[in-house]
């Protein structure tokens, strides 16, 4: 986007501590962020899309306060659509096929299930549209995987960080608008659908999400199709087990 690059030039001229580097090759979200990381000098690295707009003024102070904890590797934020409904409040791994944002579509002030939409907490993954990570952790896990060009690079990255022993935190106090896919457009071409499907298969083959992965921050009695609602399939299966063992008692009316 021309206005994006014009803004980059403007802030680089106005601030001595701002350095803009340019990626000349084709789009690969992972490779581009790994490229930028090589030029960054701080102990904490912020991945921030150019299609977000800050709402919370002290975004860095809040996220840094969490990320400085020794057990934390990554901190993500609450992202909103421009109508002030939720676009991202943490990622549920195993939902939406492989992974999905929870609480999508509720109002930004809606507490959600058990207040989880408005409470900072540990999660399995957060979106990289706004993600703060320790430099040491980024280096330890080898950054983002280049094979995830567009989709699931953040989920894979977070799972790598969790596997390395660090927590992923959703900071409910930090809010931004997220105007999704402003630079690239939406996934609406045959080529992009194929690429998306390939990246889905890659994520599953790496983490075995469809077979064995269990999100530790989600109750297994709840549905992965209708988030935070009782999974009646599990409920009925449990009932049949109890009946077979002669241990079932019908609920009193």
Positions of predicted regions on the chain:
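Glycine-rich, basic loop-to-helix element that forms the pyrophosphate-binding segment
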Residues: 23-40
């Amino acid at each position: 986007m021309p206005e994006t690059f014009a803004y980059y030039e403007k802030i680089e001229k106005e601030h001595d501590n701002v350095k803009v580097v340019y990626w000349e090759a084709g789009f690969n979200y992972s490779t581009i962020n790994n490229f930028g990381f090589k030029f960054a000098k701080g102990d904490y690295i912020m991945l921030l899309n150019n299609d977000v707009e800050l709402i919370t003024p002290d975004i860095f102070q809040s996220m840094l306060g969490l990320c400085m904890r020794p057990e934390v590797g990554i901190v993500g934020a609450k992202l909103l659509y421009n109508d002030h409904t939720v676009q991202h409040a943490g990622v549920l791994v195993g939902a939406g096929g492989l992974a999905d944002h929870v609480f999508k579509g509720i109002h930004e002030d809606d507490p959600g299930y058990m207040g989880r939409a408005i409470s900072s907490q540990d999660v399995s993954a957060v979106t990289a549209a706004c993600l703060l990570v320790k430099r040491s952790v980024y280096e330890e896990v080898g950054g983002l995987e280049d094979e995830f060009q567009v989709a699931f690079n953040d989920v894979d990255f977070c799972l790598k960080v969790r596997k390395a022993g660090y927590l992923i935190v959703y900071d409910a106090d930090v809010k931004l608008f997220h105007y999704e896919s402003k630079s690239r457009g939406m996934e609406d071409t045959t080529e992009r659908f194929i690429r998306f499907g390939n990246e889905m298969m890659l994520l599953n083959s790496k983490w075995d999400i469809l077979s064995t992965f269990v999100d530790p921050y989600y109750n297994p009695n709840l549905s992965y199709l209708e988030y935070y609602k009782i999974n009646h399939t599990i409920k009925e299966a449990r009932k049949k087990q109890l009946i077979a063992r002669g241990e079932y008692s019908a609920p009193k009316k």
